[in-house]
């Protein structure tokens, strides 16, 4: 089969995508496919228009890749691709809107305040919540632009930093606990969750360095959480995946609170990292699936969409 891999891109997650793309291309070649690699840039739209392939594997992360725009273009060109479609991609990228769907699906979310750059006035802003809080851009991944603020001064600095990345930002309650993630796999109506992965960062936070630098985080499979919480996050992950209209695969992140209360969903990743240190491949290993087998499974499921 002739498969094009889109990777790289122009988002803040470009370096991650370059690594994901390399892994995806090597796996596809190992599985016997003819592979065309495209380090994608918006100026290369003509390359997609003229593309003659059986399938596109999207290895992009962040904006202009994970937000539904590339998926929309491929739909217009009638080119099949791996993974979630336009609507599910766009919703998952928009954290504030996605949380509305999660709540409707009965999944616990963090309390939040949403700010917009066009109405925000630093001099008039008055936060009445409890510290610490998490400040983050609405449409960035890999913890880019994220700050944990414990004082008003840190909050104002965090707001300024988040606004550098997005016109809409979230201020969420900070929940102390164990961060876990659940890989979801399957066509619509046939989804299943893979083993829960516990994330143990070497840094204080599971930040960009912890996520992508070798040795900066430990992934424990299965996660060291209670059977009750394991069942909760596995079921909630599938419900969240379905609520947003995701397809084929996604990865859903949670915090399991130290106080024993229900886990809190953080986000759904429709194009999770596929680097050597990524979480989804580790979850797949938990069910005996090699990296190459996982990539081929994505291809097989996408051809049945």
Swiss-Prot record:
ATP binds at residues 126-181. The keyword Iron-sulfur does not apply. One of its GO terms (cellular component) is cytoplasm. The keyword Methyltransferase does not apply. One of its GO terms (molecular function) is metal ion binding. Pathway: Cell wall biogenesis; peptidoglycan biosynthesis. It catalyses: 2 D-alanine + ATP = D-alanyl-D-alanine + ADP + phosphate + H(+). Residues 99-300 form the ATP-grasp domain. Gene3D superfamilies: 3.40.50.20, ATP-grasp fold, A domain (3.30.1490.20), ATP-grasp fold, B domain (3.30.470.20). It is an enzyme of class 6 (ligase). It comes from the Bacteria. It is found in: Cytoplasm. GO terms for biological process: cell wall organization; peptidoglycan biosynthetic process; regulation of cell shape. Pfam families: Dala_Dala_lig_C, Dala_Dala_lig_N. Its EC number is 6.3.2.4. Keywords: ATP-binding, Cell shape, Cell wall biogenesis/degradation, Cytoplasm, Ligase, Nucleotide-binding, Peptidoglycan synthesis. Belongs to the D-alanine--D-alanine ligase family. Cell wall formation. This is D-alanine--D-alanine ligase. It comes from Halalkalibacterium halodurans (strain ATCC BAA-125 / DSM 18197 / FERM 7344 / JCM 9153 / C-125).
